[in-house]
Amino acid sequence: MKIESAEFYKSVTRLEDLPKDGLPEIAFAGRSNVGKSSLMNTLMGKKDLARASATPGKTREINFFLVNGKYYFVDLPGYGFAKVSKSLQENWQQLMEGYLKSRAELKLIVLLIDSRHPALPIDLEMNEFLSFFGRRFAIVRTKTDKLNQSALAKSKRESEKAFYDFEFIMDFSSVTGKGKKELLSVLSTYLTS
């Protein structure tokens, strides 16, 4: 897949505001500071299209990016920071559950994990959450440029052992671009199936 155009489409805080045009979606999920914005920007070929919040865990909306005018890349709120009120956490959970339960257009969720921390409890909880809703998801390990080959291989084995029900697992570096072509190729098959 070649991305020729990508633009911000809309932010959503309520399920009734989700796009109604029926275009297929790939959603990106991950804990705060995992490199989700960097990965999405690298895939879309834009430096600052998907923006990271200045305060980790602050973003509480679902952001839609129209890609090639044919499908959406969806930036889900980062999880894992408790520096927000309980009511805001509950609203986020309701929004996420509603989106994951009912979204027919959602073809795949890409769960990002930091390759330096291959099996954090919070990421394993998200694995359970996605499995519970019966959604197809893949694991993309970020920040792979920060580990040497030996540590990277060990980390990948740990991830493969800890996570379950995933479609595939692959490594990605926004710094070097490693994995970009392969990930876009795989995502293309889900968008057209």
Curated annotation (Swiss-Prot):
Domain of life of the source: Bacteria
CC cofactor: Mg(2+)
Q: Which UniProt keywords apply?
A: Cell cycle, Cell division, GTP-binding, Magnesium, Metal-binding, Nucleotide-binding, Septation
- Entry-linked InterPro entries: G_ENGB_dom (IPR030393), GTP-bd (IPR006073), GTP-bd_ribosome_bio_YsxC (IPR019987), P-loop_NTPase (IPR027417)
GO BP field: division septum assembly
The record's section on Pfam families has: MMR_HSR1 (PF01926)
Q: Please list the GO terms describing molecular function.
A: GTP binding; metal ion binding
Q: Which HAMAP family does this entry report, sorted A to Z?
A: GTPase_EngB
**This protein is called what?**
Probable GTP-binding protein EngB
Give the source species.
Chloroherpeton thalassium (strain ATCC 35110 / GB-78)
Print the organism lineage: Bacteria, Pseudomonadati, Chlorobiota, Chlorobiia, Chlorobiales
Q: What would be the name of the gene that encodes this protein?
A: engB
